[in-house]
Amino acid sequence: DGVAVKQRDEAEYRKMAESKPEWKKYSDALDSLNQYIKNNSDKEYRYAMGVEYFFYGPEFFKMIKASSELFNGWNTGVSAEVFSAEKNKLISSARAFIKKYNEGVDQSIFNALTLQYQGSEISANPNWSLINVAALSGDIYGKSIFTDSTRFIQFVTSYTNKSSKRLTNDPAFVFYNSYYPIFVQEVDKAFRQYQAKITPLMQRYVEGKYTMFPNDKH
């Protein structure tokens, strides 16, 4: 049992740390580490759920990310040559991507993971309670340019500054850009702060293992 082994190892660690005054810092670090992890378990959980959803979830998320340079490039005034090259690269990538894309499978993944992610986030972000996943899924896979090869390639091929208005009505684009920024600006940021606090405590704890148990395999 992993929990029992952890408890046994930590009890042995504390007992050894109490044997010398100069080692007390190691048991203090262990206590602080465990307490901090307990108090901030939500940060690790929300981060893990967000990574699974936004980086390993439905394929249309990847299409939106891949398109961002093209859409942002137009708005930032890149040269016509650069813009055209970016457009052609995106069309080429889309055609390669389409060969292995299965809309039905992707929609099933979206439905399952969105329900799961909604359940994990709803207490932190009440806006999730407003989302009907089945209805949203129908809109995204029935209307979005990012879930249909023909719609996507036609859109990119004829993309101009006026095309950006269509994006504001695209259900996949609107959904992704409503919730992914929250993950980046809130969840990811909080997790990195959590890690920054954990790191020195973990380093002190590991230092204690090497100092107090030099003959053990670490």
Label for each model-derived stretch:
Residues 1-218:
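Terminal presequence/propeptide segments associated with secretion/organelle targeting
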